[in-house]
């Protein structure tokens, strides 16, 4: 059985026991999070839309790899360096409920 959930403006296809990194969530490590399933595919092959829940546990918070933003204007002696690290939350899917 798998489900499609939406969080942080993105959609993820998840299965039980799967670990994934999503946009930062306002939960503490160890707390459980409940997502609404946009699509749910059962083991018998049937598909249901906007039904079901996905229960996940927050495993860790972190920051992604550093990205460099560089602005440059030719012939004007204008250069700007800026770094960015996107925060994320790592979750583990505990259960998918129909």
UniProtKB/Swiss-Prot annotation:
GO molecular-function terms, A-Z: rRNA binding; structural constituent of ribosome
Entry annotated with the keyword Iron: no
Keyword annotations: Ribonucleoprotein, Ribosomal protein, RNA-binding, rRNA-binding
Quaternary data: Part of the 50S ribosomal subunit. Contacts protein L20.
CC per GO annotation: cytoplasm; ribonucleoprotein complex; ribosome
UniProt protein name: Large ribosomal subunit protein bL21
HAMAP family, alphabetized: Ribosomal_bL21
The keyword Ribonucleoprotein belongs to this UniProt entry's keyword annotation: yes
Domain of life according to the entry: Bacteria
Pfam families, sorted: Ribosomal_L21p
InterPro entries recorded: bL21-like, bL21-like_sf, Ribosomal_bL21, Ribosomal_bL21_CS
NCBIfam families registered for this protein in UniProt: L21
GO annotation, biological process: translation
Organism placement in taxonomy: Bacteria, Pseudomonadati, Aquificota, Aquificia, Aquificales
Known role: This protein binds to 23S rRNA in the presence of protein L20.
Recorded family membership: Belongs to the bacterial ribosomal protein bL21 family.
């Amino acid at each position: 059985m798998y489900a499609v959930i939406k969080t942080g403006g993105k959609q993820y296809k998840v299965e039980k026991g799967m670990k994934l990194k999503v946009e930062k969530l306002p939960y503490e490590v160890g707390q459980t999070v409940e997502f609404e399933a946009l699509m749910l595919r059962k083991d018998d092959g049937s598909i249901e839309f906007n039904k079901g829940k996905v229960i996940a546990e927050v495993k860790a918070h972190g920051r992604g790899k550093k990205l460099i933003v560089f602005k440059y204007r030719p012939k004007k002696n204008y250069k700007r360096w800026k770094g960015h690290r996107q925060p994320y939350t790592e979750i583990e899917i505990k259960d998918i409920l129909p």
